[in-house]
Curated annotation (Swiss-Prot):
Domain of life: Eukaryota
Lineage: Eukaryota, Metazoa, Chordata, Craniata, Vertebrata
Swiss-Prot/TrEMBL keywords: Cytoplasm, Developmental protein, Nucleus
Organism field: Mus musculus (Mouse)
Pfam family membership, one: Mab-21_C
Designated name of the protein: Protein mab-21-like 2
Gene3D superfamilies per record: 1.10.1410.40, 3.30.460.90
Subcellular location: Nucleus; Cytoplasm
Family: Belongs to the mab-21 family.
SS bonds (residue pairs): none
Amino acid sequence: MIAAQAKLVYQLNKYYTERCQARKAAIAKTIREVCKVVSDVLKEVEVQEPRFISSLSEIDARYEGLEVISPTEFEVVLYLNQMGVFNFVDDGSLPGCAVLKLSDGRKRSMSLWVEFITASGYLSARKIRSRFQTLVAQAVDKCSYRDVVKMIADTSEVKLRIRERYVVQITPAFKCTGIWPRSAAQWPMPHIPWPGPNRVAEVKAEGFNLLSKECYSLTGKQSSAESDAWVLQFGEAENRLLMGGCRNKCLSVLKTLRDRHLELPGQPLNNYHMKTLLLYECEKHPRETDWDEACLGDRLNGILLQLISCLQCRRCPHYFLPNLDLFQGKPHSALESAAKQTWRLAREILTNPKSLDKL
C-alpha cells in the first residue's frame, strides 16, 4: 500500500515538474503579452475618465487583480475608489450577490459615482459597467495595440479579444476590507478545526471584492433591480487559505488535468470548481500533516472522487456561499459527460500511476 502511494506521489511530482511547470511558464508568458495590451487600453480609458484608474500592477512577478480562468482566458479586476458613502447590504435574496445603498443622511452629490445611483439610492453595477464598456470601446480604437485587440460584442461584460487567441474580461470592482458578508456567516463551520482561529481572522480581515458582472444565479432573467447588484468574490481569501503544505501543488495538478482532459463542450468545468473542491478537501483533512508531500496522491484522489459526486448530483456549492451553486445553468448532458471523463481519469491515475506520463 505504502509502495503504491509512494509510486503515485513520484509520478505526480514528475507530472508537476514536466507538465504543470510548462503550463505555468506558458501562461506567465501569455499574461505579460496580454497585460501590455490591457494596460495600454486602461491608460487610454483613464485619459477620458479619471474615475477609472488602472489598478493593474506587477508585484513580485504577479499581476495584482489578474485571475487566470484558462490558458487563453483571463479576468482583470479594476478597483474603483470611494465606496465609503455606501452601505453594503447582503440579505441573501440574490445568492452570490449584494447591493450598495447610499448611507442614510448622505447626499448623492457626496459620491464620486453620483450619476450611477438609482432612484432608490442603490449604486448600480450595471450602469457603471455600461459606462465603462463605452469608454473601453473608444480606448480600443485609439490605443497603440488597436490592430491586435477587439471588443467582444453581444455581452454586457467588458471583454477583449487579443491577437484572435486570448480573451480578457475587465471587471470594475470595489475592495471590501474589515467586513464580512452575512451570506458567508456560517464560515468557518463550528465543528471543523480547519483553518484555525488565527487564519480565520486573517482571511476575514482580507475581506472580499464586489464585482460588476452578470450574476451566476440570474443569467438570462435579470430584472433591472437585480442587475444593479454586485457579485461577491473571495479570491484573495481563498489564496490565503491554500498556503502551506502541498495544497498549491495539488491545485496546479488539478488545473493542468482540467485544461488537458476536461475542456468539454458546454464548458461544465473551470479551474474555480477545482479550487472550490480543494478548499472542501482541506476541511475534510484539517491536520497539516494531511498535506505533506507524501499525501499528494491521496488528496488528489479525494478531490477527483468528490468532483465526480458533485457532477452526478449536478450541484457544486460555493465554498463561502453554500446557497450559490457553481453548476447553475450548466447543461445536464455536459455535467454527465464531465462525470464520465473525470471517472476515467481518476481510475487511470489510481490504477496505473505511470499513465500520468501520457496524460
